[in-house]
Amino acid sequence: MERSKKLKEAILQRTDEIEEDGYHQAILNIMYEHWQENAGSYKDTIEWYKNEYGELAQFAVLIGKYNQQVTNGGHLQYYDNGYADEKSGFGGHHDPDIPLHQILTVLFSQSGLRDMTSTAVFNILQEFRIALDTTEFLEEDQYDEEGNHYLDRVNNDDYGEVINTQYLSKLDKAYYEICDEFMKILEQYFKEKITGDKK
């Protein structure tokens, strides 16, 4: 409860930001400022934000980054840039178990957002998964100088790459159809949480 009160006080001091960009963005801005000043990992920053301001702040950031990444480059970008796991940053090896995304899904389920649009978004969040190519080596047909056939074992250039991109594209399309409406719902949700005003 104390952390929730601290978040409310911090946000209500940002009247210019609220007027220009809204309550949700004001919540995100606190995290961004800390992240830039401390240059820690995304995971560490999210953990700091939760410890400092509570789960509402954590939910605001996780759902905000999800929306930004998916609307910018789809669910594949969300994964590739590391916002679904604990290793932010493009490239590298990201965790296909997407632990931060799993936290987002749990927080969403506890949020009380039950309207039709939010329920559709929650379903998309639950359906998001990553499948990687786990075949490290391939066998290729080869022939020796005398024409005898043999199989040669070669490296698979796609080893570790995401292979369910068509599935992810379907999730992208489903989200794009409702994301604008969902952002309006989220803004009202965070406004109510900060101010208590249901109008």
What residue spans do the PLM features occupy?
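Non-transmembrane, aqueous-exposed alpha-helical and coiled segments at domain scale
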Residues: 97, 101-112
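Extended, alpha-helix-rich binding/interface surfaces that flank or overlap catalytic cores
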Residues: 10-79, 85, 89-95, 115-199
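Acidic, metal/ion-handling microdomains and their immediate structural contexts
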Residues: 2-3, 130
